[in-house]
Amino acid sequence: MNVLLGGLVIFATFVTLCNGSCYLMPNKMVPGDSTKECTDLKGNKHPLNSRWKTENCDECDCLEKEISCCSLVAIPVGYDQDNCQKIFKQEDCKYIVVEKKDPNKTCEVTQWI
């Protein structure tokens, strides 16, 4: 029993860390319209039960009543902020942490959110 409980605690912690930045948008259905799709914030249409990645590094799901989106970006917080800086790489949807004096050298990161 303790093993199961411990496993659930670890799983819940992992899920919390992975889903740190999510949001929901209502899926605007027009009464009498039988189309099964979602319209994102840019006006693009997506089939029901589909998944896509936005240019803002969110992963979104088209559900029947809503669009669910979660950030794919982990933000570094455990690093030497006096000597290092974080740089966002849009094309990879990730941060790198480098030395301020020599941006060719990476810094150690001990914690991400």
From Swiss-Prot:
Protein origin, superkingdom: Eukaryota
Any Gene Ontology CC annotation: extracellular region
Predominant localisation class: secreted
Signal sequence, start to end: 1-20
Annotated S-S bridges: 22-70, 38-62, 57-93, 60-69, 84-107
InterPro entries recorded: PSP94 (IPR008735)
Cited PANTHER family: BETA-MICROSEMINOPROTEIN
Name of the protein described by the UniProt record: Beta-microseminoprotein A1
Species of origin: Saguinus oedipus
